[in-house]
Regions:
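Acidic, glycine-enriched active-site microenvironments
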Residues: 1-103
Length: 103
């Protein structure tokens, strides 16, 4: 059992199925990753699945997540625009690292 992951999994069960943007935070509360989702509950819970199938960089990010916040949007397009704006504003560590893999 991992109390940190148990907490994150439990918190995802309370998420909405609406589109939105999520902000993964490290132990100090710093934003380390920003992502968008058409279904916040499904997307965020996929990071904390009991049998994850993550790339090494995503696994590294998940290992450093201690909490997350989210913002509900009216549409996927609004989530995309907000995600882009927030990434430019915060320059989260893992958005930059994961971008390198997308060539």
């Amino acid at each position: 059992m991992n109390p940190r992951l148990d907490y994150l999994r439990e918190k995802t069960s309370l998420l909405t199925t609406s589109p939105g943007v999520y902000q993964m935070k490290d132990e100090g509360g710093n934003i380390i990753y920003i992502g968008k989702a058409k279904n916040l509950r499904n997307r965020v819970s996929s990071y904390f699945a009991r049998t994850p199938n993550h790339t090494p960089k995503v696994a590294s990010m998940v290992a450093n997540v201690y909490d997350y916040d989210f913002i509900v949007t009216h549409s996927e397009y609004e989530a995309l625009v907000l995600e882009c704006s927030m990434i430019k504003q915060h320059s989260p560590k893992y958005n930059i690292l994961l971008k390198d893999d997308k060539g």
